[in-house]
A protein has these predicted regions:
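Periplasmic/extracellular electron-transfer cofactor-ligation site
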Residues: 12-16, 21-24, 85-109, 134-139, ...
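Flexible coil segments in periplasmic/lumen-exposed cytochrome c-class electron-transfer proteins
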Residues: 22, 117-123, 138-182
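Conserved Rossmann-like nucleotide-binding pocket used by diverse enzymes
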Residues: 7, 84, 114
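Sequence/structural segment immediately N-terminal to covalent heme-attachment motifs in c-type
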Residues: 73-97, 110, 125-126, 131-132, ...
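Periplasmic c-type cytochrome electron-transfer domains
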Residues: 11-75, 121, 144-155, 175
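Short Fe-S-cluster ligation motifs
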Residues: 36-42, 118-133, 140
Length: 182
């Protein structure tokens, strides 16, 4: 008898008979009067995942991309500086020399971005490392969206240029300002 009562209780239609809105029905709950809601930001429509796009993978035909898949602008580099400060500088240091605060606390030192091997690495290499991790570095794919990964890479390139820049690298109009400064 008790078993029959337990089984009968499990036969309720709660999941079938639940309060819900039908697609495109009217709704008094939402201010716009529609039950259909816009997709959450970052939603990918079925069949539209850009898994083969260089922007999202950092690769073309399996090889790291040699050039940025988006225009590099001052705004992109500034965004990269902001993101680098948050995600990268604790280990890699503010100058990209591998002397971040975690190293001073006894953790393993990451490589400097200023060694020839990394100065010559294509942007796709950095994208892959940020996405998948490398050595002691964990993947940042879940924390840093692709747009910000490219921004960070642009900033790393700016850091690399800044550490070995000469007067000949300065545009002529700015060079005159520097030479005339006291």
């Amino acid at each position: 008898m008790i078993a029959l009562a337990l089984v009968a209780g499990a036969c309720r239609q709660d999941m079938h008979d639940q309060p819900k809105y039908k697609p495109l029905a009217a709704s008094a709950f939402f201010a716009d009067g529609k039950a259909a809601r816009p997709p959450v930001q970052g939603t990918v429509a079925r069949g539209h995942l850009h898994a083969e796009d260089a922007f999202y993978t950092g690769r073309v035909r399996g090889e790291p991309v040699a050039a940025f898949p988006l225009p590099v602008s001052r705004q992109l580099i500034e965004r990269g500086r902001e993101r680098y400060t948050v995600f990268c500088s604790p280990c890699h240091g503010a100058l990209g020399d591998g002397q971040g605060m975690v190293v001073r606390r006894g953790f393993r030192q990451p490589p400097s971005f200023h060694v020839d091997r990394l100065r010559q690495a294509p942007p796709g290499h950095y994208f892959d490392v940020i996405t998948n991790g490398f050595g002691a570095m964990a993947s940042y794919a879940s924390r840093v969206p692709p747009e910000d990964r490219w921004a960070i890479i642009a900033y790393v390139r700016a850091l690399q240029l800044s550490q070995r820049a000469g007067l000949e690298d300065v545009p002529p109009e700015k060079r005159k300002e520097l030479e005339s400064a006291p």
